[in-house]
Amino acid sequence: MIDRRDLLLGGAMLTAAAGAAALTPHRHVQFLGSRKLEDIIPRHIGNWADRPSEAFILPHDPGSLSAQLYNDTVARLYVSPNSIPVMVVVAYGNLQNDQLQLHRPEVCYAAVGFQISASTPAELTLARNVRLPVRELVATSDSRVEPICYWTRIGDAMPTTGSQQRWVKLQQQIAGIIPDGVLVRMSTVAEPSQEVFSELRRFGTAMVASIADVNRPVLIGPTLTAEMRAAGA
């Protein structure tokens, strides 16, 4: 005969199992699909053009566990006759979950010996009343100083901190969605100043504007893409 305690325990286990099943994502959202970042991001952006360079801090090392986070990456140096050079890294991962998630620059720069300071939120104005949240920070090593401006996209959300990123993933999980994600990072080697960060933001705005409307969701998600389209941008 099954006693009352066993019945209660069994009921609790069934409830827990049902809750776990409800929180198990079932729909995988991928905005890149079969396309390549190399083809999406123009080699000429405003009055900047790409030039070969090896001066990059990449978000992963080939063959490492973190390399599993990213299915596609692009690293380019853009130079301009009348502005600062801009190093651009775009890293895309088609799976964002508890085991695999984007590494924010605060993590990957610190991992190779940089000190992180002056981390502040900012925005790119993509069109009238259309703003993209970004984060600005300074990475310093013995050999160089890098002002950095970056954003991350998880599904259709644009978290600017690690805690926001974790909260977004939980919300997506509750909604039954397995999101993709992208890191877009712009930096230069210079002493940090308002003028330098302003140029990084200007480059970021020009980069989004230069990407075809059909490809913009890969970098900024469908909501901001639709808002830009509605604003005529």
Locations of the language-model features?
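N-terminal secretory signal peptides and thylakoid transit peptides that target proteins
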Residues: 1-15
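Active-site-proximal structural scaffolding
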Residues: 12-13, 41, 200
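Membrane-interface motif at the C-terminal end of an N-terminal transmembrane signal
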Residues: 18-30
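Alpha-helical transmembrane signal-anchor/signal-peptide segments
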Residues: 28-41
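Short secondary-structure capping/turn segments at boundaries of alpha-helices and beta-strands
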Residues: 35-37, 60-65, 73-77
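Short extracytoplasmic
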Residues: 41-67
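A cross-kingdom signal targeting lumenal/periplasmic-facing segments of multi-pass membrane
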Residues: 68-202, 206-218, 222, 227-228
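Short, solvent-exposed mixed-charge patches
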Residues: 232-233
